[in-house]
Design a protein with these regions (language model features):
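C-terminal segment of classical bacterial N-terminal signal peptides
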Residues: 16-23
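Residues at the start of alpha-helices and the adjacent loop-to-helix junctions
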Residues: 3-4, 17, 37
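Bacterial N-terminal signal peptides that target proteins for export
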Residues: 1-10
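Metal-dependent phosphoester/phosphodiester hydrolase catalytic core
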Residues: 25-524
Length: 524
């Protein structure tokens, strides 16, 4: 890491080179460097018109050389991604784009260390960000992406924007009718509409700063397409629009065969695996109405919870008094249903078993820990494959951890094979840490809406998520109403995760009222 003096000088050079805001007006969506390895990177920008865009790069901000060019085309909303090769490991690079007389701001990133290098790595992740205003022309409804701004100030080796990087169907003004999410505005279903959503989010300076500040990994979840997306339920046309829009605005490695599955090595201590949990999944178990609760006519809110547990909460949620249809439970447990698809599951399990990195981090779109509420879109809704995966990792791979977003909450727990079922808890020994959101409705407020009970989300957190089995699921941290992110530090002997709010402070546990303690994984 640079000394403080060198950092100040470098920052001053960046400011002077970037010039006044008007100097970069042609590149007003900013710049980004993605998929960074020890020798390669993908750099991104958006021009204001079609034509050739050139990228210049160097190890000093004051001396940038031409490194590649690509056309900005209207068919890709004038976005440009250029591959950089033959970079040096663990080296800081500066880059900027040029089109005619127009210059972008200067971005920067550091390449990954060599796989053999013993180096401490620090990174952060969050997701779930929506800049939709309440009224046209107004400010974003949720916030101005302060979480992203705080992440940029942390000077991490890299940052991860982990899913729901736009909201094709915004929760601003949305309602819940019979347990179903109903957006207030028409969803963005076309390519052009999705482009507009990405431009809307990039209108926030904090996100642009984060993308320009260092290596930036992007990943999708469902809202890049539509809520709870699967091709089986929502079709290939919507998938194609979502894929192109995402690739146009995020410098990522994608193929039709493997989707967004990929992995990156950051020195001897760390390998990061990104699972694609949208491209190949089966339809949810709710298809055909087999999980509809007879009292509400909508999908049951906790079909896999034991009936004894449901009875405890029936006063709060009367539909829990109704038994769950056996066909629903059979669908959830169907071994033929998949989250990852056979090819990806095989590639991932082989790769993580072969990995020579000390710690293996799995970037995970939806929680794999068990907490029963609304399980259909999560790993719990694909129970057989969840069990197979966790059993394999438990038996074959050391030092694994799941880092997750999607549920708009901070939830930390062992990804148990079972929790409240007959026979009692069975730990996997693998922790799942869920964080966020950056800027959308929190889990607590979503539960309020789904149940129609004021503060129902906090009540369920305190009465069920926090207590240890058999009275609850025993989360070690549960903060369901905080804009947040997670920061990870990896050394040769220890991986440490700290969950932080938009001010950089530890998130507060809703059960204890105290800051959530760091999560520590010591090397086995």
């Amino acid at each position: 890491m640079s000394t403080r003096a060198r950092t100040v000088v470098a920052a001053a050079v960046l400011v002077s080179l970037a010039g006044a805001p008007s100097a970069g007006a042609a590149f007003d969506a900013g710049v980004a460097a993605g998929e960074v390895t020890s020798t390669t990177a993908k750099v991104w920008t958006r021009a204001d018109r079609a034509g050739t865009v050139t990228v210049r790069i160097g190890t000093r901000a004051s001396r940038l050389r031409r490194a590649g060019r690509a056309p900005a085309r209207a068919t890709h909303d004038d976005t440009v991604t250029i591959d950089l090769k033959r970079l040096k490991p663990d080296r800081r690079y500066f880059y900027r784009f040029v089109q005619g007389s127009q210059r972008s701001e200067v971005g920067r990133f550091r390449t990954a260390p060599r796989p053999s290098a013993r180096k401490t790595i620090r990174f952060a992740w969050t997701g779930d960000a929506d800049a939709q205003p309440a009224t046209a022309g107004g400010p974003p409804f949720w916030n101005r992406f302060e979480v992203y701004g705080r992440m940029a100030r942390e000077r991490n080796a890299f940052n991860v924007n982990m899913g729901d990087t736009i909201y094709s169907d915004s929760e601003v003004g949305a309602t819940h009718a019979d347990g179903a999410f109903v957006p207030a505005a028409p969803p963005a279903l076309t390519l052009a509409d999705k482009w507009a959503k990405y431009r809307q989010n990039l209108g926030q300076a904090a996100l642009r700063r984060l993308r320009a500040s260092g290596a930036f990994f992007s990943h999708w979840d469902d809202h890049e397409f539509i809520n709870d997306f699967s091709q089986a339920e929502n079709g290939t046309e919507l998938y194609a629009a979502g894929v192109q829009a995402f690739r146009d605005y995020a410098p990522v490695r994608y193929s039709s065969q493997d989707g967004l599955y990929r992995s990156f090595r950051w020195g001897r201590n760390l390998e990061v695996f990104f699972l694609d949990e949208r491209s190949f999944r089966s339809a949810k178990a709710t298809a055909g109405g087999v999980c509809n609760n007879p009292q509400t006519g909508a999908p049951d809110l906790a079909p896999t919870a034991p009936q004894a547990t449901r009875n405890v909460f029936a006063a709060l949620i009367p539909s829990f008094a109704q038994p769950v249809a056996p066909a629903c439970l059979a669908a959830i447990g169907d071994p033929n249903r998949t989250m990852l698809g056979a090819r990806q599951l095989d590639r991932f399990t082989r790769a993580i078993q072969r990995s020579k990195a000390t710690f293996k981090v799995v970037m995970n779109e939806v929680p794999i820990q068990q907490f029963y509420a609304l399980p259909y879109d999560r790993w719990e809704g694909y129970a057989a494959e969840r069990t197979r995966l966790l059993t394999f990792l438990r038996d074959n791979v050391d030092n694994v951890i799941f880092l997750t977003t999607d549920d708009h909450a901070n939830f930390v727990n062992d990804a148990r094979l079972q929790t409240l079922e007959d026979g009692g808890p069975v730990d996997s020994g693998i922790v799942d840490i869920t964080t966020g959101p950056a800027a959308t409705k929190s889990f607590a407020k979503e539960i309020d809406d789904a149940t129609g009970v004021a503060d129902g989300g906090l009540l369920i957190t305190r009465a069920f998520f926090k207590p240890a089995p058999p009275n609850g699921v025993g989360m070690t941290c549960a903060s369901p109403d905080t804009f947040s992110y997670g920061q990870v530090q990896v050394t040769a002997q220890r991986l440490t995760v700290r969950l932080k709010d938009a001010n950089g402070n530890a998130v507060v546990d809703a059960g204890t009222g105290q800051p959530c303690a760091p999560i520590v994984l010591d090397r086995e």
